[in-house]
Amino acid sequence: MGIFKKTVRSAMVREDFAKLPRHVAIIMDGNGRWAKKHKLNVAMGHRQGVETLREVIRHTDDLKIEALTIYAFSTENWNRSKEEVGALMQLILDFFKSEIDELMEKNVRILILGEKDVFPGKQREVLIEAENRSAANTGLTLNICLNYGGRAELT
């Protein structure tokens, strides 16, 4: 996220918004390492990652960047410990429940990329609801890659 912040700050200082990208893509990686470095449990690292994501979404929308793609949960993430996967599933629920109204107010369109069918019922429902509620929105397109893996694209 450091490069994103540097690019945005640089453009804002110069008031050169034409040089901002139309589409920003971020791989959410390193939350566990961050937590370990700060002597916190992995779940706290993921929570901090979600807080940073909220910030990035707001800045991206404020700057009128057209699309933001977040690679949040790969197909390989299912192989993590049961506790970590459970914490990530709870974060999905918490994020959408707390953010959906603001995202709707900001006219954000949400697209979930990846196989939704494998998610537990509540998570699957909240993902489908977010897509359906925002389908007609015309502002920022927020692509969230969940249960997504590049290997699936190769077949």
Specify the residue positions occupied by each region the protein language model found:
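Flexible, compositionally biased loop and terminal segments
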Residues: 1-155
